[in-house]
Amino acid sequence: MQQRIINRVEGDPHYQQYLQSFEPEHDQSAAAAIILAARQIARTVGAKAIVSFTVGGSTAQRASKKRPDVPILAISPVEEKARQLALSWGVYPDVAAPGSIDTDDFRGMLSFACETALAKGLVSDPNDMIVVTAGFPFGTPGAANIVRVVPASGPTTWDASL
């Protein structure tokens, strides 16, 4: 019953406009700009998911507040934060095993994001696009400062026709 109500409300063509009418003044930080850009980029390129690398969860929570049209995969090395993020709208948390993410290898992080999105079923086709957000230095709360578009097949398989 609740799912039907949610689907009907969120399916209304004026839903996004209605939500935005209640938004307070925009946060002027770089992290806020990255989140807004990720949502718009996802819509523009038809991305199937937004992947957010996060330690404290603030980036994924900010993205959730903006209600993007696609699911948010929050990858965190902190299990407690991942559990908390499970309560955020549209967020699918994943706990990265210790050592599975080399924060000095951004291409490796992008590959990990693609593999995880495929494994979680958020994308199904290798040509599906994913928008990835991260903050460097990694682990700094609220430091989202990178947004990247990558095909689900990985960062080394970019095809200009995509």
Per-range role (PLM):
Residues 33-47, 109-124, 128:
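Phosphate-interacting basic helix/loop segments used at nucleotide- and nucleic-acid interfaces
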Residues 48-51, 70-73, 92-94, 128-131, ...:
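Structural motif
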Residues 115-138, 144-156:
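C-terminal binding/interaction regions
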Residues 46-67:
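Acidic/histidine-rich
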Residues 59-61, 67-107:
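Nucleotide-binding motor/catalytic cores of P-loop/tubulin-like NTPases across gene-expression machines
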Residues 28-36, 57, 79, 103-111:
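Electropositive phosphate-/nucleotide-binding environments in soluble metabolic enzymes
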Residues 1-39, 162:
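Long, charged amphipathic helices and adjacent flexible linkers at domain junctions
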